[in-house]
Amino acid sequence: TADLTDPSTQTFLSSLSSILVAEFPVYYAIAKETGLLEDLTQTWGADNANKILAIAFHWMHTSSNSAYLFKSWVNGKLLPYWDSMESREMTEFFRELTEQPDWRKTFFNARIARLPEDEVLSYDSTRIATEAVANPYVQCGKGKEGGYQKQVGLALLLGHKTGMPVFFRMFPGQIADLSTVADMLLRFDEINDKKKIFAAVMDRGYFSLDNFAKFVDHDSRVIVAATMDVKWIREAIEKAITSLWEACSHIRGDVFGVTVPVKPKFEDGVERELWVHVFRSDSKSSTETQAFFADLEDFESQWKDWDDDAHTGACPLLNSRKLIYYRKPTGLPGKSTLERDNEKINEAIRYFGFFCDVSTMPARAAEVYDNYCARDLIEKAFRSGKSDVEMNVARAHSDVTLEGRFLISFVALTILTDFHRRMKQKTKRIVKGKAVVDRPIGDEMTLKEIRNYLASIRLINDGRGNRIWQKVTVRQHNIARRLGFPDLYRELPDWGPR
């Protein structure tokens, strides 16, 4: 037992300090495994790469991207960079990041190079509120809550198979989403000088012949959800319809699909070929049919039971769109019987259970279906960015500092999307010589709950460069294991302050 009165013992004890570890090793391990740390280092150097990660860790840990809070937060934590930064210093750092020559090509090309050859990208954009004044990207636009606010646009490309964000671009807040797509993909092609990506996937908001003309003319490989009531889409469905009950058209479950090449008429008279991928789902058909006839039955019941004496003003049933499914009534509601127009009803229900995508390149219906089903990844990524790193608020006064902020958000988003991917994976462990499969940890706890469980983990530094773990619980080790890092809180980290 050491003599606590001994001066050397007292000196040793006074040199001991503990630092908060929490979930930071998970973030760092993900940054290494995804190649993010290497790509940041290649683009901006090791010191700046560590600064970028430390700021991203701050934003993820606190769910706040306020620059002025970093100084009061950074001390006593295991971080890749641990010196404090004033708000002004951080703003200058954001500026320096975007003034690095060719950083976009170097960094994004490095991220793209890590994608598999058959990767599919989802495109989406969002508008972010800002208080910035001297910024050409900031425009006044209508907010989701109504009214007008200053906004800047952010567009993102995210890989389906990897779940990784690979490219982002700012645009003025008042520019419509449709105007950013071709530009985004064109810039992506300019930056990407090696890898041919299978396609970019977009939602129904981008469906129009004008957009398809731009995509084809720019040689952009895209998949877009189709609007079903368009003539050339209906014609494609009619060509495919007899094949959608055949075994060769089966994709999975109750979904069947057929691809139909089409050459719709473009306004400029130029001939362009597109591919309509027509799908049929029995469960979708059943749901839509039940809902349709339930609405008709409810309407007929209201018509039959209508009592003019119990209401004032004109009867709203007389203006209902549902009347198109009936013969012309012989009298008023409550005083006549409705007769269904079966021809109109047949027209309405003919395409129940059908849905379509359109691509600018030939592809099998099955691979288009698989790729479009994965599109919700980008929507989840944006939601995570807004809730976990406050990406819905941009605190910057110039376009260069704003882009620097978005770069940090992009880094945080890369780590978070991989974190969420790991939360969805099953893991194996050996118990008494037998393999046991654990269900995904995301089935049991949220990201914030995982952070809370890891929040107590600390390291002790002895002032001589040596470290030792404070108590790490079995639960904390199991969380790390189920995230794919079984030894994360056993092996001593070789980074951070000592």
Regions found by a protein language model. Name each.
Residues 49-50, 62, 86, 119, ...:
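Secondary-structure capping and boundary motifs in well-ordered enzyme cores
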Residues 1-134, 155-174, 348, 378, ...:
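Dynamic "connector" segments at or just before major functional cores
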Residues 193, 212-221:
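Short, surface-exposed basic-aromatic patches at helix termini and helix-loop junctions that form
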Residues 176, 201-210, 228-231, 400-402:
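Acidic, metal-coordinating catalytic cores used for nucleic-acid/nucleotide bond scission
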Residues 412-451:
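Conserved nucleotidyltransferase catalytic core and NTase-mimicking acidic/glycine-rich helix/loop elements
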Residues 150, 167-170, 220-371, 447-498:
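An anionic, glycine-rich sequence signature occurring as long contiguous blocks
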Residues 368-395:
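Short amphipathic alpha-helical "interface-anchor" segments enriched in bulky aromatics
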Residues 169-191:
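Active-site beta-loop-alpha junctions of metal-dependent nucleic acid enzymes
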